[in-house]
Amino acid sequence: MLDIKYADISALIKKKISDFHYKNEIIESGIIINIGDGVANVYGLFNAIYGEIVEFENGLKGIVLNLEEENVGIILIGSSKGIKEGDKVIRTGMISSINVGECMLGRVINSLGVPIDGKGPIYGNLFLMPLERKAPGVIYREPVIEPLQTGIKCIDSMIPIGRGQRELIIGDRQTGKTTLAIDTIINQKKFYDMGNPVYCIYVSIGKKASTIASIVKLLEENDALSYTVILTANASDSAAMQVFAPFSGTAIGEFFRDTGRSALIIYDDLSKQAVAYREISLLLRRPPGREAYPGDIFYLHSRLLERSSKIISDNKIASKMNDVPKSIEKKILGGGSLTSLPIIETQFGDVSSYIPTNVISITDGQIFLETNLFNSGIRPAINEGISVSRVGASAQIKSMKKISGTFKLDQAQFRELESFSQFGSDLDSTTKNIIEKGKRNIEILKQSINSPYRLGYQIAIIYAGTNNLLKEIPLNKVKFFEKKYLNYLNDKYSSIIDLLEEGEINENIFSILNNVALKIINKFFN
């Protein structure tokens, strides 16, 4: 028989009792008083926070958007099927957030970060980032001095974009806005291959699923999906998903920015987000303002776009940045940037309506696309006269800045004289020369879709245009000259192209570019 020591048993029981801590878990809940159109009014959540996630009885999540004296207004993230008046709603204490990480690259996700591309779950290191976050303070920012190459001749020469800038793409439907953005993503491949990637986030709002599928296929064909995250809220998704899609995309971009890397985010387009936000605001019974938009529609876009910035290079200062999420506190590095290209759709070219004027005033410049130019075969259909980049010029490399210095002015002068020439046929030789030069420059700026140009090629052909080397070439042969000219430079003077991309420019390079142009002209046009 075992020798049982009752003293030991007594001591063990006492220890277990002393180690036991009973903890009351307080769960705050409320009751749905009415629900409809994706919005629920709930009584009882007196301590709810704006932007907090709440959970319904069937597991569906919602976000608190209205805080009133007696109840809170909640938008549902998903279908309201199975939810009814009298159901319980529980606070989670969590602010709306999304899991982000490098493992998201190459995937298609929704506004909640859930993959929808049929490739299974996302595996890897993920970090929780809030959807809503304060923009970096002034002391944590640096001036925009590093270029973001788009590969589009008209933009890189006359409307340059810098890393950390916010440049609006604006125009009517079917003028090539999305194409400009996708071409910019494709052009980042060479930087990815060189080990200095610009990670891209393409946020689609209110588009058809078939359109997204074609964009994914296009990026795959150009090997651009490996450094891109596609976040989509389709036309069939709820208004809430469309409103929060840009915020989710920005959280992903901020992860790359705050860990010392460069990122580019495209919002396609914020007009549809504004419409979805108007729908939610009206359902929440907020007072409508101009064009029935709520009073805080400007704040919706300003707080979103202000988060795009160039972070200071000093790691010590960057580590103290305001409002850093705890999940990435130890990964903060300086020198990162988040560049944004918001897209706005106009109606009949009217840039003076409410949403376009709001976003123009928030951003650092705009690229305006015109239907008339598009229909006349000038593609990309950029009106360089009213397009502007307010901070990008300081980020332009030396060689491009020197060669394209008078380019925009020349084209503006050409536009003015061209319209004037329609009223009379008697023009002096100087005016005729300006018009002929302008027409050839327009031919130079034309570009096929999904075919971004190397920076060195851009500089070389723009040099030929600005120095009037094409004056003897027929207008319909300018593209033929361009092809032969760039091929010859690539075959015989590839080192010159490399020097131009490094910012080098001198009389020797000018001489080579002149001689090559003359050789091509003498061979094919004389």
Curated annotation (Swiss-Prot):
Belongs to the ATPase alpha/beta chains family. Gene3D superfamilies: 2.40.30.20, ATP synthase alpha/beta chain, C-terminal domain, P-loop containing nucleotide triphosphate hydrolases. The record marks 387 as: Required for activity. It comes from the Bacteria. It is found in: Cell membrane. It catalyses: ATP + H2O + 4 H(+)(in) = ADP + phosphate + 5 H(+)(out). This is ATP synthase subunit alpha. Its EC number is 7.1.2.2. F-type ATPases have 2 components, CF(1) - the catalytic core - and CF(0) - the membrane proton channel. CF(1) has five subunits: alpha(3), beta(3), gamma(1), delta(1), epsilon(1). CF(0) has three main subunits: a(1), b(2) and c(9-12). The alpha and beta chains form an alternating ring which encloses part of the gamma chain. CF(1) is attached to CF(0) by a central stalk formed by the gamma and epsilon chains, while a peripheral stalk is formed by the delta and b chains. Produces ATP from ADP in the presence of a proton gradient across the membrane. The alpha chain is a regulatory subunit. InterPro entries: ATP_synth_asu-like_sf, ATP_synth_asu_C, ATP_synth_asu_C_sf, ATP_synth_F1_a_nt-bd_dom, ATP_synth_F1_asu, ATPase_a/bsu_AS, ATPase_F1/V1/A1_a/bsu_N, ATPase_F1/V1/A1_a/bsu_N_sf. One of its GO terms (cellular component) is plasma membrane. It is a peripheral membrane protein. ATP binds at residues 171-178. It holds the Pfam family ATP-synt_ab_N. Transmembrane segments: none annotated. GO terms for molecular function: ADP binding; ATP binding; proton-transporting ATP synthase activity, rotational mechanism. PROSITE patterns: ATPASE_ALPHA_BETA. Keywords: ATP synthesis, ATP-binding, Cell membrane, CF(1), Hydrogen ion transport, Ion transport, Membrane, Nucleotide-binding, Translocase, Transport.
